[in-house]
Amino acid sequence: MNPFAISVLTAPKGMTHLFYVGQAGFIVKSKSGQTLALDLYLSDCGERFEGHIGFKRLLPRILSPQEVIFDYIIATHPHFDHYDVDSMPFLMSNPHTRLYASVDCKQFVDQAALDEKRITYVKPGNTCHAGDFLLHFINCDHGTLAPDAVGVIIEVDGKRIMVAGDTCLRLDRKDEYLSKGSLDVMIAPINGAYGNLNEDDCAELSKVLSPELTIPCHYGLFATHGGLPGLFMEIMREKCPDNDYLLMTMGESIIL
């Protein structure tokens, strides 16, 4: 078993844990021990899907889909690094696991003949009760690449985590992002490709929303995806020096 899987499984109860799996993938473990996985990319299917080396995985996998049974899974849109078609059948193999997926993920659900009774298709404005987690799905502007993509505000153990999802900068949606209250954590991409926020955009969003902690993601795994964490640091220091941020390495966890 991978050491990272062991760290997830043995993370003590009584605390809220946030783990980084790489790319846009995160795991939240509640105080009672329930687990929520978000946009996990655990395979090498990207290079096969896209047909060129620009989507070759450049960092090793730290988790196999068979190693951890998740209570809940979120797939914000059907791109391979958010809905991993190779891994999802394994992730959903336990009859206890539930999936919350954007409506355009259904094609892959049908292809894999997953159990529809354990799947909820979500749109912006939907709220779902998932055990210890309250999930508020929000608008996500990923353009024509994924018109039904969603972001999500996760409420757990008195904490509020906003995952912006794959989106461009939409400051006009500030009220939506803060509709449930102030944010403890904001997670957003910095790669600046395929319609996503770049380093400056992420810093600007952090400045406007003023979360307690900003965590950039969506960089470092593919040669074609871009994203410079060093540049993000420089911009944060200039644009919003009072905002705390954290660059998480794959396998790292924090207590919220």
Stretches with model-predicted labels:
Residues 1-46, 50-53, 231-238, 242, ...:
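Zn-dependent metallo-beta-lactamase
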Residues 10, 31-74, 86-90, 167-180:
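Pre-active-site segment of Zn-dependent metallo-hydrolases
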Residues 11-16, 29-36, 127-136, 155-161, ...:
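Beta-strand-turn-beta hairpins that frame and shape the catalytic cleft
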